[in-house]
């Protein structure tokens, strides 16, 4: 299969599944299971629930896809990815 036959969609990671797979809600409303592309594994790009991603799929199987890109957040660099700030966890007396 040539790469020209693959189609791309954007979506939102809703759940992290075992074996490096993700449940992704596409912008079109469909829900699929996707795995991480080799280049993302090689460069150690972590994907968490709630991340916007680009999925590459074969037109022959629209239930599975390959996660090829994680979109950057609108948060400023250095800001925590999730949860409340933990600044006061260890205080001096």
UniProtKB/Swiss-Prot annotation:
Pfam families: eIF-1a (PF01176). Its main location: cytoplasm. The keyword Transit peptide does not apply. Residues 69-93 are annotated as: Disordered. InterPro entries: NA-bd_OB-fold, RNA-binding_domain_S1_IF1, TIF_IF1. HAMAP family: IF_1 (MF_00075). Belongs to the IF-1 family. This is Translation initiation factor IF-1.
